[in-house]
């Protein structure tokens, strides 16, 4: 991945994290890499464990970032979440949800989609 694209991704993830923290969520982990995929942000929203996918699109004409979280990507996120929970058994009993923060434009505008998909969507 080109350096400029990596920097943009890191900046958008940091902005997403800041927005979620301002809304009261607390960071548990960031950029957690597993065999099946990566979890951009893992956060707590009260008793809820939240797996957050952050997606940036420079231009939203062809669907925003959330549109790129297709069936295949959702399956990878679920697998990564399962591996995360296996590695952190103290968190495994918490209720979980999957959120998406999509960003588009320059400067990026963020849109937080709570409960963007459920396990039965995978």
From Swiss-Prot:
Coiled coil regions in record: none
Any one Pfam family match given in the protein's UniProt record, by short name: UPF0102
Annotated signal sequence range: none
Any one Gene Ontology molecular-function term assigned to this protein's record: nucleic acid binding
Record-linked InterPro entries: Restrct_endonuc-II-like (IPR011335), tRNA_endonuc-like_dom_sf (IPR011856), UPF0102_YraN-like (IPR003509)
Family, similarity comment: Belongs to the UPF0102 family.
NCBIfam families with a match to the protein in the record: PRK12497.1-3, YraN family protein
Name assigned to this protein: UPF0102 protein XCC0710
């Amino acid at each position: 991945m080109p350096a400029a694209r990596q920097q943009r991704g890191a900046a958008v993830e940091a902005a997403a994290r800041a927005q979620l923290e301002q809304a009261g969520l607390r960071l548990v982990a960031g950029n957690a890499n597993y065999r099946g995929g990566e979890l951009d942000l893992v956060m707590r929203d009260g008793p809820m464990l939240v797996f957050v996918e952050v997606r940036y699109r420079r231009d939203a004409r062809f669907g925003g970032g959330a549109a790129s979280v297709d069936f295949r990507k959702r399956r990878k996120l679920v697998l990564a979440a399962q591996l995360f929970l296996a590695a952190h058994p103290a968190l495994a009993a918490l209720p979980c949800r999957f959120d998406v923060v999509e960003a588009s434009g320059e400067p990026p505008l963020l849109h937080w989609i709570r409960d963007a998909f459920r396990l039965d969507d995978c």
